[in-house]
Amino acid sequence: MTLAEYEWMRNQLDEPIKLKKKRLMLDRVQEDSFDPYKEISNNRRHFKKTEDLYYLVLNLHMVEKTEVSETEFEFLRYECRIIEEYLMQIPDYGQFELSILADFPWIFSDRFIENNYLKIKKRMRRLAQLNNHEQYLFTFLINLTSFYIENGRLKKARSVNEDMKRSLAHKERSTVIYETLMADYYQRLISAALGEEKTKDYQEFFTVLEYMLGKNQRRSLEKKLLAIAEPSN
C-alpha cells in the first residue's frame, strides 16, 4: 500500500464526520440568530487547541456562504496566512490540502500560486489517477480563472483558461461536457472583457449552454458576462 492509498482510505473514515459538521454550520448561517464573528472565534479556538486546519477552513466556507463584503473578508487574513504557511511547510499535498486549493485559490498570495502551480496540478492529476477525483484540477483552474477575471487580471485569467482547455483536450468529449462548456464560457468572457469580441456574437453559444445546463444557469452566466463586458462595449 502506498502512502497516497493509505491517506485516501483514512480520509474516507474521517471525512464524513467533518462534512456533517460543515453542513450543520452552513445550515445555521441562514438563521437570524447566527453570529459569524462568534463562529469564527470559536473555530479559531478549536484550531489552537487541536492544530487541525479544518477549523480554519470552516471559517472560509462560512464567509463564502454569507457573501461578506471585502472589508469583512479582511477579518480572515489570519486564516489565509496560517493556511498558506502550512502548505509551504509540508512536502506534499493530500486530499484535504488539494480541496483547499481547489475551493479557495484566491486566499493565496501570487508568489505561492506561481511557485507551486505545477506542483498543485501534478498532485491533482495523481489524485485523479488514484480514485478518479477529476474534479479537483478543474475546480482549481476554474476558480482561479474566475478570481483573476473579477480582479481585472485578464492576462493571468487567459493563461489559466488556456491551461484548463489543454487539460480537457485529451479527454473523451462526451465525459467532460460541463467542463468544456465552462472552459469555453470563460474564454468568451475574457475576450469580451478585453473588447476583442461583442457580446452579440455569443448568442449561439448561450443557446447551446441553455440546452445543456438549463435556463437558470444560462441567465446567471449570461448576466455575469454582460456585466463584465459592458464597460468595454
Language-model features: where?
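Amphipathic alpha-helical segments of tetratricopeptide repeats
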Residues: 41-45, 81-88, 121-128, 162-173, ...
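Basic, Lys/Arg-rich alpha-helical nucleic-acid-recognition elements, primarily the DNA-binding modules
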Residues: 1-20
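Helix-turn-helix/homeodomain-like alpha-helical modules used for DNA recognition
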Residues: 15-70, 79-80
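Residue signature of alpha-solenoid helical repeat architecture, marking inter-repeat boundaries
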Residues: 49-56, 91-96, 135, 175-178
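C-terminal non-catalytic interaction modules
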Residues: 189-233
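Residue at a conserved register position within TPR or TPR-like alpha-solenoid repeats
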Residues: 104, 141, 148, 191-193
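Helix-turn-helix repeat elements of alpha-solenoid scaffolds
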Residues: 28-42, 70-81, 110-122, 154-164, ...
